[in-house]
């Protein structure tokens, strides 16, 4: 009987006491509206402590590399940020536009990935649009000579040889039979074909007479 009375007394005294947290030993405090997400982040960090150490950005950053490859274009690498939710965490993930990676693989009969010896030669690539804006020449200027771009050429003179620009239209320089006109030096021991043809014609003429 005495034990039951003591139990009721103890229960009444514990109910009158404020509710305390068993782990912290502090009374609960009211949180502001801005502080409502802090316990969720703390709980997620306690459950997954390694989430804060995982880099959530892409390994391949093409923006600074393109700026180094083509500094004259003056392009600024544009990035897009997309929210990524992991439990209670809100992380901004950076994604570069116009880059679509393609991963090619081949599965076996039972859904297992084949080894490199059994796989054929498969290429992986990146589809990149507008790699160098302003750096691609139009088709009309692709084969233009840089020495001729400053001056204006007449019609039909794009592929004119500079040695024959001074000659009249329709007349091309013809060989006169002498080596001095073209300043051609024939190596010793090699006879020009024109001299051989002339000797053959003179011998045939002498044989006819």
From Swiss-Prot:
A Gene Ontology BP annotation from the UniProt entry: positive regulation of biomineral tissue development
Signal peptide (from-to): 1-16
InterPro entries (alphabetical): Amelotin
Keyword annotations: Amelogenesis imperfecta, Biomineralization, Cell adhesion, Glycoprotein, Secreted, Signal
A single cellular component GO annotation: basement membrane
Family from the record: Belongs to the amelotin family.
Role: Is a promoter of calcium phosphate mineralization, playing a critical role in the formation of the compact, mineralized, aprismatic enamel surface layer during the maturation stage of amelogenesis.
Disease entry from the Swiss-Prot or TrEMBL record: Amelogenesis imperfecta 3B: An autosomal dominant form of amelogenesis imperfecta, a defect of enamel formation. AI3B is characterized by hypomineralized enamel that has reduced tickness and exhibits structural defects.
This protein's name: Amelotin
Taxonomic source organism: Homo sapiens
């Amino acid at each position: 009987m005495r034990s039951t009375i003591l139990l009721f007394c103890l229960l009444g005294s514990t109910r009158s006491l404020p509710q305390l947290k068993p782990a912290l030993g502090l009374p609960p405090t009211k949180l502001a509206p801005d502080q409502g997400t802090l316990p969720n982040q703390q709980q997620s960090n306690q459950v997954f402590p390694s989430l804060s150490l995982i880099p959530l950005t892409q390994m391949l950053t093409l923006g600074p590399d393109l700026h180094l490859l083509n500094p004259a274009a003056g392009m600024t690498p544009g990035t897009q940020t997309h929210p990524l939710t992991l439990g209670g965490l809100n992380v901004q993930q950076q994604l570069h536009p116009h880059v679509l990676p393609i991963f090619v693989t081949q599965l076996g009969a039972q859904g297992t990935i084949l080894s490199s010896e059994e796989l054929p030669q498969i290429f992986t690539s990146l589809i990149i649009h507008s790699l160098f804006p302003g750096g691609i020449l139009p088709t009309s200027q692709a084969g233009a000579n840089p020495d001729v771009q400053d001056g204006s050429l007449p019609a039909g003179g794009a592929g004119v040889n500079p040695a024959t620009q001074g000659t009249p239209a329709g007349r091309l320089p013809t060989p006169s039979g002498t080596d001095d006109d073209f300043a051609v030096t024939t190596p010793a021991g090699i006879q020009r074909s024109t001299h051989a043809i002339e000797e053959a014609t003179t011998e045939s003429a002498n044989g006819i007479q």
